[in-house]
């Protein structure tokens, strides 16, 4: 009997690659539900191929259009956050993959976990802003399976080990497209240039985050919650080749690394086949062809977003909520050419400076602070 899969954000980068992997594993999985924002054309193609029982469009108008397009099919079309929560909570789901981008992913994450579903988490913002709310679920083995390549690597490396055996986690960062670009030229960076990631095929927002190193900062906070490690035990190393996805140093000072080609289909597949490994679509890694691997310390003067993320995580409470919300607004402003690339961390820092931390937030607190930070960030971007 095939297992049933729900994919939130099926038209995005992780979502489309998930469906590609699922086609490779079609003897094991079937699609129960898919969701998208407003890409009706692509989700129609996905619906006709995978024949899900449910489809969700965040955009109400797009939902109406999709209903019309699929009038010859039996799939039920839902809309909005209510629709996302509904499909995240389906009892018959064997796995819910949250591949949404941004804070919109939090409520579906909470819904999936509260309903008892296993969660494949690519939406790092769920943990960044909601870590205090959902951390109790993270202690249940196999309930949250990380999709991010770095956290998926650590998840595999820690298999068979307990927290007391871990000395530190080492997250690798490519350094993005501007690793060697002088800081004084950041103000001249174009959106087109920032969207050219040297190694990974990702969506627009996460590619910009990679260019500022904010993506790695968000991943540090995510790792803190996923693996129950204090921030001083989570290090970042710049590794331009993106061959080593992460490392773990144990108390005996041995270091184990997870390596492979820069292909998101590998961690996605592991989430779908956990705890087994099967043949994948990824290219075999040939180290002799590569020839060398390089490493360097991240420059937090040149890339202050990483430092801001550490500060937000260490301050805790609602500060990571502010960090994430301000970053989303600043990145959007840059992508719409309202601010220059170098102003992204400036906006974030100014909003963080104005925040009064709530130390033990509930879901309502998180939503309220998220809204406040977005409004404040929009004000700040208008002043830059």
Swiss-Prot record:
1-deoxy-D-xylulose 5-phosphate binds at residues 124, 149-150, 174, 197, 210, 215-216, 219. NADPH binds at residues 11-14, 38, 123, 125, 203. Keywords: Isoprene biosynthesis, Manganese, Metal-binding, NADP, Oxidoreductase. It comes from Halothermothrix orenii (strain H 168 / OCM 544 / DSM 9562). Catalyzes the NADPH-dependent rearrangement and reduction of 1-deoxy-D-xylulose-5-phosphate (DXP) to 2-C-methyl-D-erythritol 4-phosphate (MEP). The lineage of its organism: Bacteria, Bacillati, Bacillota, Clostridia, Halanaerobiales. NCBIfam families: Dxr, PRK12464.1. GO terms for biological process: isopentenyl diphosphate biosynthetic process, methylerythritol 4-phosphate pathway involved in terpenoid biosynthetic process. It is an enzyme of class 1 (oxidoreductase). Mn(2+) binds at residues 148, 150, 219. This is 1-deoxy-D-xylulose 5-phosphate reductoisomerase. Belongs to the DXR family. It catalyses: 2-C-methyl-D-erythritol 4-phosphate + NADP(+) = 1-deoxy-D-xylulose 5-phosphate + NADPH + H(+). PANTHER family: 1-DEOXY-D-XYLULOSE 5-PHOSPHATE REDUCTOISOMERASE, 1-DEOXY-D-XYLULOSE 5-PHOSPHATE REDUCTOISOMERASE, CHLOROPLASTIC. Pfam families: DXP_redisom_C, DXP_reductoisom, DXPR_C.
């Amino acid at each position: 009997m095939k297992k049933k899969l729900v994919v939130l954000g099926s038209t995005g980068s992780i979502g489309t690659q998930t469906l590609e992997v699922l086609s490779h594993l079609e003897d094991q999985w079937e699609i129960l539900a898919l969701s998208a924002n407003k890409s009706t054309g692509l989700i129609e193609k996905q619906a006709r191929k995978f024949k899900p029982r449910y489809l969700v469009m965040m955009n109400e108008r797009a939902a109406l259009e999709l209903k019309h397009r699929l009038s010859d099919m039996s799939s039920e079309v839902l809309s909005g956050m209510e629709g996302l929560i509904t499909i995240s909570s389906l009892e018959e789901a064997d796995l819910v993959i949250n591949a949404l981008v941004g804070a919109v992913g939090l409520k579906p994450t909470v819904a999936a976990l509260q309903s008892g579903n296993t969660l494949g988490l690519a939406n790092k913002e769920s943990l960044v802003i909601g870590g205090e709310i959902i951390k109790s679920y993270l202690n249940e083995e196999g309930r949250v399976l990380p999709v991010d390549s770095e956290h998926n690597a650590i998840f595999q490396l820690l298999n068979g080990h307990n927290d007391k055996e871990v000395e530190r986690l080492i997250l690798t960062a490519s350094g993005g497209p501007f690793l060697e670009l002088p800081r004084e030229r950041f103000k001249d960076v174009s959106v087109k240039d920032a969207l050219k990631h040297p190694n990974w095929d990702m969506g627009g927002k996460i590619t910009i985050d990679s260019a500022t190193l904010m993506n790695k900062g968000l991943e540090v906070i995510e790792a803190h919650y996923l693996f129950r490690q204090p921030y001083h035990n989570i290090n970042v190393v710049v590794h331009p080749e993106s061959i080593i996805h992460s490392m773990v140093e144990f108390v005996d000072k041995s270091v184990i690394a997870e390596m492979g080609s820069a292909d998101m289909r590998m961690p996605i597949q592991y989430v779908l086949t956990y705890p087994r490994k099967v043949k994948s679509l990824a290219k075999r890694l040939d180290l002799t062809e590569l020839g060398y691997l390089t490493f360097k310390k991240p420059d937090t003067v040149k890339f202050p977003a990483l430092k801001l993320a550490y500060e937000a995580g260490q301050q805790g409470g609602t500060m990571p909520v502010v960090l994430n919300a301000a970053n989303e607004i600043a990145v959007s402003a840059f992508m719409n050419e309202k601010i220059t690339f170098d102003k992204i961390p400036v906006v974030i820092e100014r909003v963080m400076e104005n925040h009064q931390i709530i130390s033990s937030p509930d879901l309502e607190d998180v939503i309220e602070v998220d809204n406040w930070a977005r409004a404040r960030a929009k004000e700040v971007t208008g002043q830059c």
